[in-house]
Amino acid sequence: MSAPNRQLVPIPGPSALPIVGNTFDLDLDASIQSLVNMFEEYGPVFQLTIAGHKQIFVGNVQLTNEVCDESRFCKIVFSGLELLRSAVHDGLFTAHEGERNWDIAHRILMPVFGPTKIRGMFDQMNDIAQQLCLKWGRYGPTFPIEVTEDFTRLTLDTIALCAMGYRFNSFYRDNMHPFVDRMNRFLKDTNTQSGLPDLFNSLWLHAKKRNKEDIKAMREFSQEVVDQRRQNPVDADDLLNALLHQTDPKTGEGLSDSSIIDNMITFLVAGHETTSGLLSFAFYYMLKNPWAMEKAQQEVDNVIGTERVTVNHLSKLEYLNAILRETLRLMPTAPAFTVGALKDDVIGGKYAVKKGEPINPILQAVHCDKEVYGPDATEWKPERMLEEGFHKLPANSWKPFGNGKRGCIGRAFAWQEALLVVAVLLQSFTFTEDDPSYQLRIREALTIKPDGFKIRATLREHKTTAGMVPESVQSLRQAQKSGKPGNSKSSANESMVGQGNGRSVSIFYGSNSGSCESLANLLASDCAKYGFSVQTTDALDAARENFTSNQIVLIVASTYDGKPADNATEFVNWLKSLTGEPLKGVSYAVFGCGHHDWATTFYKIPILIDELLEQRGAQRVAPRGAANAAVSDLFSDLEKWEESILWPALGLTPALLESQGDTQPRLTISFQRPYTQRKEFLEATVTSASELTTSASPSRKCHMELQLPQDMTYNTGDYLAVLPLNPLSNVQRALSRFHLAWDSVLVIEATGPTQLPTATPISVADLFGAYVELSQPATPRNIRALAGAASDEPTKQALLKLAEDDFATQVRDKRLSVLDLLGQYESVALPVEAFIEMLLPLRPRTYSISSAPQWNPSHASITWSIIDTVSWSGHGRFLGVASNHLYDLSPGAVVRVSVRRSNPAFHPPQDPNSYPIIMIASGSGLAPFRGFIQERALQQKAGMTLAPALLFFGCRGRDDDLHRAEMDDFEKSGVVRVMRAYSKAPNEPDAFGCAYIQERVWSERKEFRELWNRGATVFVCGGTKMSEAIKDVFIKIAYGNAGQDDNKSSRDWFASLDPHRYVAEVFN
């Protein structure tokens, strides 16, 4: 806002001294408390000069609300955050406004932190929480527990397991993991340096050296986690797989290797530091206010009792929610954020601020604004944060998770984790202070935590340490149950169009997290089931060209920080720009998703779309539906809205819904002779198979040679897509349950969209084995369908209870599939058509080809890692579909494959004498270069002259030196020269003292530079750490500036290289 008619006044504050500014006005060990105290002297706004830069601090709700206006202010990275960039560069937390990598990473990672995905992480969170309970239970009632340290262990292990599938096992260590020690020291140093003048920092050489060591250690650890995932891939829908494999839905770009590491460290730090502080402060306040502890424990007893805590319990713990909110009000563990004006501006009607000048809301002061929270604002009273009071708070009066689009992306993750931990601890223990005279001391880095706070924990009467083995672990000991034969007769039902009468429906969604997209796909399937003709299911931004008067438009949308999803922004802007009634004749309905903790923007965008469509002439055919992710399941809410509101509004009668319900399949099946499977995949024959690693190796790798089908060709460096089969044990369970023989043949006809093979005879074993997922957890709708097919009332009622009250604990938490439930409830006479319709399609997997096509004509080889781990469902083990299928194949077996082309530049030269090649690989990255070298050997044998070729190969040691005998033969023949590095045995003669491949490249830099100057192409294949290190050493060698005094110009030179001269591919 501007104030042309008001007198501007200077922003108050203490006088700054030359050079040191206001450094001596702050206690560098308690800078936040120093700032909070200054508000008492200077009022709600003051300024300081810190580290040579003027900064403005605000401490009330009115000014905070003003600077949170993203049309006038944006986040700026300054002071401590700017120093953090030395470690994490432009990661999500430290990126400057407008940095491209932030936009890409944010769009890629938003789906990972959607409400459905967070709920799916509950079991892993509970795994770590139970480890904490077991540790405290074994301490006994007199042991002083270092609360902050153990909560740090807990939150670090939780974010690592949930986001990256990595176990720190912190509760089994005497000391913290080295990553934590490095991180804590780096954060403390950074916090101290942020308050010192640049001159002082420039002289603090010891801290600079220590910072570099800490950064190196943190990035190396993160790289190891990435390398482990790449060497042992898992089919997990987690943050690490998103970083490695997902692309930006807007630009199609993926993350660079460096950006992957930046964001991994960001999440490991931010994902546990603030939550551990929250938990520590919460227990401090509860113990200092025993009436609140008693009330919280009573709520846990009433809601959960002695049962295992489930995700559905959490939304019912209203008082625990209030405790966490009130704790973050008084002790916001991320105590401030920084914004800057987009242009010169005025705040508070009288204080001038310059463009980009740092403005810091100090949340401990803002959250104690007596104008909002009353005269007792500094007192801890959870009752003020119960649902009704919390949602009446003014905008931006509670900001512990930051602001707007740069707010905490992991808020829902942290909240679910904190609620779970408090609940299980209160369920298991009674607590006392170790020292009742303890007064709160705060330890500051970039976050705050209690310092020196200790407690004692006594097991409650209903708890024992023996009983603390998590239910999920106990269930892993159960033997896998197999289904028994059920109804052996499958009747083909008549095709029913339904009362949709073929009316056209278009469905659109606005979704960053992926939840609304999933809901839209479910809605499309249901529309087809009831006789509607689904024209499209697409993002809202595609809707402008698809609004016609002869169809029904259904919209599923959510709100992100008060704004539309990224793929709905253009649509909303278009809708706002319309005038008059240009949408007259369009029929529509809107279903909105939200979370009530974002009270000021709850359902904002769905409501806006609903109202604007009506204002512009469209006809609302059904009242808007709504799902609150904080208290319910989105998919169940959509089903309720469909059945109670949407279908009746569209003229579907209860009789039709009953007749075409979930037990009535839309498929017609008849049995005929066997027929060939999917046409895009052809049969290849296994000619040899071997395991490359020993049984002691943590990562089992295999090698397979395949005879390709006729006319299937590939080029050296290409990929092979494999169509896998489900494990035979699961296929047999399904066949047995429906009393079907392996060679039974069926034909599928569908009245709606399906990815199943239709109008084609297919073996039922092929269908169950190669087309559908048999282990996907059942949904409430699936279970209701089973209930409808039950032949006795007790079974029906038991299944209906599973679909409702017991769904989370007995189905979702145990990840029971439809097949599992059919095995448990033998009286369910479900038609095979209905079962097949419930299953999701099975996808192919892709592998690098590690051979040259001419080496063994019509053959190709592949390499892969075997996935065999404990199943989440408790039904035996989880077997990777493709990896175990391939492992089970013997020479002569058939597998269906299809060639996929690689990067056009990632191929050896057709004329081997045209230019030299330099190949650089680590570990399994050797695979494509094995094909390169085979091709050169054949060219040499044909009498062709070979330009020089170098292979730099890094691995652990001689025992890990893949294809060693073969490579020795190639080297003796002059096809290639191999130069090795052994990370675990650098003193071996072959390694020439080099532990890492970049060291070996540098040691051979003279020959490397000579070949480069002769026009060599450099090929790199390996992990991100290796690829980055090779790029750095390559620039030093090829650019000719070993000191890298002009790093920017050398990087510019690298960026301008012919993309065919330096080709790098990350190995997965």
From Swiss-Prot:
**Amino-acid positions noted as binding FMN in the UniProt annotation, renumbered to this chain:** 511-515, 590-622
Give the cofactor note. Binds 1 FAD.
Top EC group: oxidoreductase
Cite a GO CC annotation. Answer: cytosol
Give me the stretches of Polar residues compositional bias: 472-498
Q: Which residues form the FAD-binding FR-type domain?
A: 679-909
Residues the record lists as binding heme? C408
- What is this enzyme's catalytic activity, as reactions? 2 oxidized [cytochrome P450] + NADPH = 2 reduced [cytochrome P450] + NADP(+) + H(+); an organic molecule + reduced [NADPH--hemoprotein reductase] + O2 = an alcohol + oxidized [NADPH--hemoprotein reductase] + H2O + H(+); dodecanoate + reduced [NADPH--hemoprotein reductase] + O2 = 3-hydroxydodecanoate + oxidized [NADPH--hemoprotein reductase] + H2O + H(+); dodecanoate + reduced [NADPH--hemoprotein reductase] + O2 = 7-hydroxydodecanoate + oxidized [NADPH--hemoprotein reductase] + H2O + H(+)
Region described as Disordered: 464-498
Q: Which InterPro entries match?
A: Bifunctional_P450_P450_red (IPR023206), CysJ-like_FAD-binding (IPR003097), Cyt_P450 (IPR001128), Cyt_P450_CS (IPR017972), Cyt_P450_E_grp-I (IPR002401), Cyt_P450_sf (IPR036396), FAD-bd_FR_type (IPR017927), Flavodoxin/NO_synth (IPR008254)
Domain Flavodoxin-like, by residue range, is: 505-646
Cofactors per UniProt? FAD; FMN; heme
Which keywords appear in this protein's UniProt record, sorted alphabetically?
Electron transport, FAD, Flavoprotein, FMN, Heme, Iron, Metal-binding, Monooxygenase, NADP, Oxidoreductase, Transport
Q: What does this protein do?
A: Self-sufficient cytochrome P450 monooxygenase that catalyzes the regioselective in-chain hydroxylation of alkanes, fatty alcohols, and fatty acids. Preferentially hydroxylates 1-dodecanol at C3 and C4 (positions omega-8 and omega-9). It is very likely that CYP505U2 prefers dodecanol, and probably other fatty alcohols, over fatty acids as substrates. Does not show any significant activity toward tetradecanoic acid.
Provide the species name: Exserohilum turcicum (strain 28A)
Q: List the disulfide bonds.
A: none
EC numbers? 1.14.14.1, 1.14.14.130, 1.6.2.4
Q: Which family does it belong to?
A: In the N-terminal section; belongs to the cytochrome P450 family.
Descriptive protein name: Self-sufficient cytochrome P450 monooxygenase CYP505U2
Q: Which GO terms describe its molecular function?
A: aromatase activity; fatty acid in-chain hydroxylase activity; flavin adenine dinucleotide binding; FMN binding; heme binding; iron ion binding; NADPH-hemoprotein reductase activity
